[in-house]
């Protein structure tokens, strides 16, 4: 069994609630296995909230809007470069380490390569985030990720309208025991 959060939008801070759903984990790396997990989480959520319309936000989503809103596909405009880049790249390139290193070249690789870049693991302690000349503290933990994600949605009017059709957000790959930020939380906000 596994547990994953569903983020539900609300009108007061922190602007979301979390419902943890326990489900039978379908192991494996195949997309079909990941989609079985998505379905299991959503089915469990609908048992609690029968009127719910949840959306998986990931490249494995069963709904195209969820794929478009994934950090690998949702684009964020970077004023200095006069170009848009995937959220994943902006997030990884925004990390600033204790020696002052910031790997802005991660904007120019695939989102998968940006996420897996070895330098991110070997550069010491993360001290802050930096984007467009603005520094972001590490606490609250998801501040920077939420900032770039929400602004990217605002920049995309079509997706900003589509996201309103849903009232619960998941990111099945996100494990709160191992990670801090999730696109599901950002979408709920």
Regions of interest found by a model, annotated:
Residues 1-54, 59:
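Short, extreme N-terminal leader segments that mark the start of a protein/domain
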Residues 7, 16, 49, 77, ...:
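Sequence-level detector for tyrosine residue identity
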Residues 17-18, 123, 176:
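Generic hydrophobic-segment detector
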Residues 57-119:
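Aromatic- and glycine-enriched beta-alpha-beta binding-site module
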Residues 108, 120-171, 187:
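Long, contiguous internal "core" modules enriched in hydrophobic/ aromatic residues
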Residues 176-189:
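Active-site nucleophilic cysteine motif
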């Amino acid at each position: 069994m596994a547990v994953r959060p569903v983020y539900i939008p609300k009108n007061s801070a922190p602007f979301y609630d979390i419902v943890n759903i326990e489900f039978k984990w379908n192991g494996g790396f195949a997309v079909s296995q990941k989609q079985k997990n998505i379905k299991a989480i959503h089915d469990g959520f609908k048992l609690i909230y029968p009127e719910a319309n949840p959306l998986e936000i990931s490249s494995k989503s069963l709904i195209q809007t969820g794929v478009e809103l994934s950090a690998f596909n949702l684009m964020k405009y970077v004023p200095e470069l006069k170009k848009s880049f995937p959220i994943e790249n902006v997030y990884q390139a925004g990390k600033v380490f204790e020696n002052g290193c910031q790997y802005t070249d991660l904007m120019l690789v695939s989102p998968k390569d940006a996420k897996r870049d070895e330098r991110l693991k070997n550069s010491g302690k993360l001290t802050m985030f930096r984007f467009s000349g603005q520094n972001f503290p590490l606490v609250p933990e998801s501040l920077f990720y939420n900032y770039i994600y929400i602004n990217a949605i605002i920049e995309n009017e079509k997706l900003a309208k589509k996201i309103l059709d849903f009232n619960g957000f998941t990111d099945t790959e996100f494990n709160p025991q191992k990670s801090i930020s999730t696109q599901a939380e950002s979408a709920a906000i």
